[in-house]
């Protein structure tokens, strides 16, 4: 028979929401996201530091390249720092993991996903353009981002103050 610990003795958890930006534009499935998080934590914190924070990938959002990572309470700042410091991945090339926020519940962590800008893809010839709702554009060739820019739509004359 399995003995349950009282709620006072069980570990407390925090949930870190993050988004992966990489040089190679590809959607990461759950396994790829898990491998990336493990490589990031091990490269920055080492095996003992990674074990201390007790990471567990709870959710992966393939369409957003985002995820929710469960860590021990009190260790969330170490996890945030380790994810943010990871810069080069053997499979994805240059990578940036943007930490969107931390929460005490999964539902609260999912609210941070609304901060990710929506995007659409357009193909012109051999180039692909990734258009974001906030006015940014990425130029993609052969699966790699080769240029990025942002633009502002000028206001019509009657709307200028």
Swiss-Prot record:
SUPFAM superfamilies: Rnp2-like. GO terms for biological process: tRNA 5'-leader removal. GO terms for cellular component: cytoplasm; ribonuclease P complex. It catalyses: Endonucleolytic cleavage of RNA, removing 5'-extranucleotides from tRNA precursor. Coiled coil: none annotated. Its EC number is 3.1.26.5. It is an enzyme of class 3 (hydrolase). It is found in: Cytoplasm. InterPro entries: Pop5/Rpp14/Rnp2-like, Rnp2-like_sf. Gene3D superfamilies: Ribonuclease P, Pop5 subunit. Keywords: Cytoplasm, Endonuclease, Hydrolase, Nuclease, tRNA processing. The keyword Hydrolase applies. Its main location: cytoplasm. GO terms for molecular function: ribonuclease P activity. Consists of a catalytic RNA component and at least 4-5 protein subunits. Belongs to the eukaryotic/archaeal RNase P protein component 2 family. Part of ribonuclease P, a protein complex that generates mature tRNA molecules by cleaving their 5'-ends. This is Ribonuclease P protein component 2. The gene is rnp2.
């Amino acid at each position: 028979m399995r003995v349950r610990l009282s709620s006072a003795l069980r570990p407390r958890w925090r949930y870190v929401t993050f988004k992966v930006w990489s040089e190679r534009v590809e959607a990461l499935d759950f396994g790829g996201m898990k491998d990336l998080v493990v490589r990031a934590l091990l490269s920055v914190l080492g095996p003992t530091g990674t074990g201390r924070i007790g990471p567990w990938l709870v959710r992966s959002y393939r369409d957003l390249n985002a995820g929710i990572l469960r860590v021990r309470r009190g260790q969330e700042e170490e996890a945030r720092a380790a994810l943010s410091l990871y810069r080069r991945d053997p499979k994805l090339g240059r990578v940036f993991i943007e930490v969107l926020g931390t929460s005490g519940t999964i539902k609260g962590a999912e609210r941070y996903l609304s901060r990710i800008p929506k995007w659409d893809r357009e193909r012109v010839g051999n180039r692909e353009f990734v258009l974001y709702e906030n006015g940014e554009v990425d130029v993609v060739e052969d699966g790699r981002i080769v240029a990025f820019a942002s633009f502002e739509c000028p206001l019509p004359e009657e709307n200028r103050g």
